[in-house]
Structure formats: C-alpha cells, structure tokens
Amino acid sequence: MSSIRKKDVERFILSDDYKPMVLKELYKKFRAKTREQRKKVREVVKKLEKEGRIFRDSRGRYRKLGEDLKVGTIEFTRSGYVAFVITDDFEEIAVPVEDTKYAMHKDRVVVEITGTWRGLPRGRVVRVLERGLKRVVGVFDHKGTFGFVVPDDPKIAYDFYVAPENIDGAKPNQKVIAEILKYPSPGKNPEAKVVKVLGDLDDPSIDLPSVIVKHDLPEPGEFPEEVIREANAIPARVRKKDLVGRKDLRDKVIVTIDGEDAKDFDDAISVEKLPNGNYLLGVHIADVSHYVKEGSALDQEAFKRGTSVYLIDTVIPMLPFRLSNGICSLVEGKDRLTMSVEMEIDRDGRVVRYDVYPSVIKSKKRMIYERVNEFLEDPSSMKEYEPFKDLIYNAVELAEILREARRKRGAILDIESDEVKVILDENGQVVDIVPRKRGIAEKLIEEFMIRANETVAEIFDHAGLPFMYRVHEEPDPETIFQLKNYLEAMGIRAKFSHKIHPGMLQKLLEKVKDHPLRSSVERLLVRSMKRAMYSAVNIGHFGLASYAYTHFTSPIRRYPDLVVHRLLKLYLEQNGYFTPEQIEKFSKVLPKIAKHCSRRERVADEAEWDLVAMKKVEYIARHIGEVFNVVVTNITKFGLFVEIPEKSISGLVHISTLDDYYYYDETRNMLIGKRKGKVFRLGDVLKAKVVRADKIRGEIDFVLVEEDEE
C-alpha cells in the first residue's frame, strides 16, 4: 500500500492541470482507501479551504480561486444597502445586499467579481467559508411562548429566533448574550439560545460586556490555563544569568513618562547634552521577547490577540498581568531587561550616530505627563522633579528640534486630537466627558518614540532583510480633489499639486492655524487619509513623511513590536546577517503576521470607539431638551452631522426637520434650501436641541433652533 504525502495532494490541487473535483474523486485520484489515507486528503483540502486558496461550490466540488474569485471577510454597513468584502490583501469589494447569499457580518466568504461600483470592484458572494460570529449580544423581545434577540450591532441584518426552551429566564427589554445555533437560510431566521442575561437596558454596567461580546474579545484578565502556567513560571525578578550579553545602564538617569492611570510601562528615556552641542537620546524598551519565546503558549495567545484593548477604565491585555504589569513593566527602582536605541542627534535633528543593544536599566523616576507639564509651567510646584530638571529641559529642547526637522521634511504635525476622557463612577455610570489634552510632555515622548521607530526601520531597510514595517499609503488623488472642493465651499483656497506630498497638507494646516474653521479642516483632512497598517513591504509612512517606519516601542501591548524585537535581536546576534533559511521563513510568515495584526488593531479600535460612543449617548440622554452650540462636521443627502465640540459628541439633524426643502450639492458638500436659498456648509456653527438618544444604536438626534427659541 503506497503512502500518501500531503505535499503531493496540495501540489496537485494547486497545479494548472487540476479540474474541480468532489472529495470522492480526490480519494480515487490518490487511491486513498483506508481511513488514515482519506484523513490526509481531507486535512489538505481543509487547510487550503481555510487559507482561501480553494472553496467548495454548490455541487460539492473543490475549486481554485481564479482572477474573478476572491476570499475575504464581509462587513455589512449600517445602511444595509451594500456590504464590503475586505480581502486578505486589504482590497475592498462592494457587494449589494441582494448578492450576499445569507452571509452575515464578519463571515469569511468567496466572492465573484461581476463589475464595478463607485470605483470599487463589485461582486457577489458565492460561498460562505466560515462563520465569523459565534455569539451575539442584543435586546430580548418576547413573542408569546418564544422570543427574539435583536442584535445591538446594526450591521447584523437578522433578528435571532429563540425557542421556548432556550430563553433561560430572559425578560423583555433585557440585554442578553446568545449563542448562535443556526445561521440564516432561505425563508428562515437564524436561531440562538440565551446563555447570559446581562441586565436591564438602563443599567450602565452592561455596556462593557456588551462590547466585549460584540467584538468577540477575551474577558478582561482571563487567559488559557497553559498561558497562565507559562506566565507563572517566569521569575518575578531579574536574575544574574539574565544580564549576560547586556550593557548595564542601571546607574544612568533613566525615567518613564506616562499617563497617571498607566500600569504597563513599555518605554523609558535618557537625554544628555554632549560637549559638542549634540544630544544623546536613549530610548529603552521593555525586552518582552526575553520572556515570551516564539511558539510558546504565551506567544500564540499574544499573536491571537494582536494587541491590548483599552476600554475606558478596563484593559484586556495582550499578555497576562504578571508580565505586562510585572517583570516586563519598567517600574521605578526595579532592575528591568530592555532593548536600547542610543542616538546622537545634532542641532538639525539628524541622527549622526546610533547604537542598538540589549541592556538592563533601573528607572530612577516614574513621571506623569500632567506633572511634567506642571513642572515646566512652574518648577517650584513640583519639587519631586527638581533632581531631574536637566533631563527634562534637555528633552524639551531635543523634542522641539526633532519636531522642527519633521516639519521641514513635510510631516503632518498640527492635527489636534479630538480624543476625550470618559470619567465613570464605581457603577460604570458617566460622570463627565472631558477633552484629553496633550501637553509638552506627551509630545516629547511621541517625538522620541517616532525617532526610535524610524532608526530601527532604517537599519532593516538599508540591510534589505525581511522586516515588519508600519506603512501609510498616500491618499487617492480623487479624495484630495474632493477635499479641495469642500475647502473652497468653506471659503478656504488650497493649492495642491498633482504629486501628493504630506508637506502640502501640513502647509494647509499652518494656513488655517488661527482660522475659526480649523477643527473642521482637520476633520476633513483625517477623513481623506488612508488607514496606517502593518506590512512586510516598505512603502513608507505618508503622514509622518518617513521613508521607513516600524512599531518597536510597545511590545507589552502590540504583537508587531514583539516581532520587531525578535528580528532586531537576531540581526544583532548574527552581525547584520540572516541565513537563506531565515530569509525564506520570514518572507513567508511576516506578511501573514502583518495582515492578522492589522485586522486585530482594527477590531480593538472599533471596540474602544463603540464603548466611548455608548457612554456619550448615556451622558447626553441626561440632557434631552437642552440646547447646545454645535459645529457641522459632515453633510449628507439625509441631513447634517453636528458635534458639541467640548465633548466631541456627535449626532444627526435629519433633513426632514429643516425649515425648507433642501437639496444636496455633492460636489461642494452643501445642503441648499430651494425656497429661501439658505446654505449649510461644513464648519457652520449652529444652535441645536437634543431630542433623542438611542444607546443601543449609538445614535443621537438634534433639531436646529433659532436664537429666539431657546
């Protein structure tokens, strides 16, 4: 009996000679008669199907993907008219809802390209490969003896039928978690069973678990047993043998500067002024790779998570707290293992010399952003920082030099964040929402981390070795043309050349620095940008105007940084050389890691945004009927999106509530009244009354009011 080799089966299926076959035909082809032989064939088929290289058609045949067939994750929209399939290469394919073939939000699907739609490829779903959702969170609705779960996520187009035996004591209008039993099919709703009743809709404590289930995140602080076992086996202190091959920096003045609530300290800095007038900047990053070994249970779980998720006052860490808040965290007064990037920087912001090496440090002070800013305002107010004044003043000087150097090369610097801090009480209820301010301390740490990330990326770019880059594509020319039209409609003239460069956009920001519409221009600019992501191919970072960039500085909370540390260590150990086998290995695995981590980052961002949006609705619900000054942030054919600037709370003024029949001028992004000729533009400051706040949908409605209506 001849043995069957999996690689032969895979080679045949992927060959040009292969014609679509059912499983029985593959068994026959390879003379697979025993259970073990057939199992090998099935395993290859399942592997290729999971990788999206083949799929099973309606006749049960396994087909290869041709030019007209793509595999990706389907994402529905709130409107429900169209969905988008995001391929593994981040290509977007528009799929009209009637062509989604019972696929649900987040399913992995095969889509056939059928044409174009608004500049994107248009397609239809031909098969669901893998269901993306296993659980759903929503509101329970009782219908006689049975019930339905109405999902919180408007992107899920179905309500889930719940049989009487699966209600589990849920009452109408309670938030529940339900396990999906059956997925949609012709003429039938999907089915689910209630597995947990979270509570009543007005209970603020249900928001966090709702977001966790909606985005399929792990429970805070929970890890698989094997991961916990590995973490517990790691020593809680640095040992003598850990210091071999490391530069001892424990006597140097090295400090951390972070937010008041931070517990996982990834990065520390040292700054000295040299006799020649240059600066010596040290960026010292937690050596997580010393403890988290490639292929270990800790590593596999960190890869799966991809990133830590910060949900207001709760963190879902990438690594167990024993590491993230313990031995890896650069806490004051404790020996800690680090990877150091030491850079001599001249008065023009150029790195004239650098060194990268494994090290051991002992942080001399755990500084806090707000207190450093207070010290810079009034040194006498912060006596505890007095011994570190030289470091602080040198850091401020150097950060300004680096920032000016980035400005000169065209980096986009002047976009003010509209991030807010949500303050909760012990019950999870919103007390207040305040702008998250960024002072000098926050900006100087940002400058130092950017420079360290660039230095590490440049090493690998020059060496031509496989690497994990952080890339940011330039905007599409059509988007910039549209931006120009919008700006002109706001009365702001902008000169854009055919060759798009970040310096053009930075000049625009400088031009509107003191303009009343500055924040509106910044929003438009952000909207016109593409999303930064991870890639094994270096295409540069548009926003930073960096020709090579990476993420090296946060390995406690980002998996790509951990990968970069491993690559950097190997580079140093092997004197800037990778073996052919290593090059082959990294060339295969790095693109997969980059795609996965880009997806996980997106999930984390959406979860963080969702919870903040819920809390904004909860906050504004206490102000129904009140009038606020608002700014128009977006205009659509169905109304105006407006924002309360000091709270970053947005909502809709529906076109049906306006005082005239308005038509939408898409080119200039305006609503124009037909009878009165009144025009609404981006950046308009108006008065609006809050009339509705729907926490489940995350929606807020306003109506405009005249001065005399207040």
Swiss-Prot record:
Family annotation (SMART domains): CSP, RNB, S1
GO molecular function, one term: exoribonuclease II activity
One GO cellular component, as annotated: cytosol
Reaction(s) the record says it catalyses: Exonucleolytic cleavage in the 3'- to 5'-direction to yield nucleoside 5'-phosphates
Signal peptide span: none
Domain RNB: 246-573
NCBIfam families xrefs: 3_prime_RNase (TIGR00358), RNase_R (TIGR02063)
The protein's role, per its UniProt record: 3'-5' exoribonuclease that releases 5'-nucleoside monophosphates and is involved in maturation of structured RNAs.
Name of the protein described by the UniProt record: Ribonuclease R
Gene: rnr
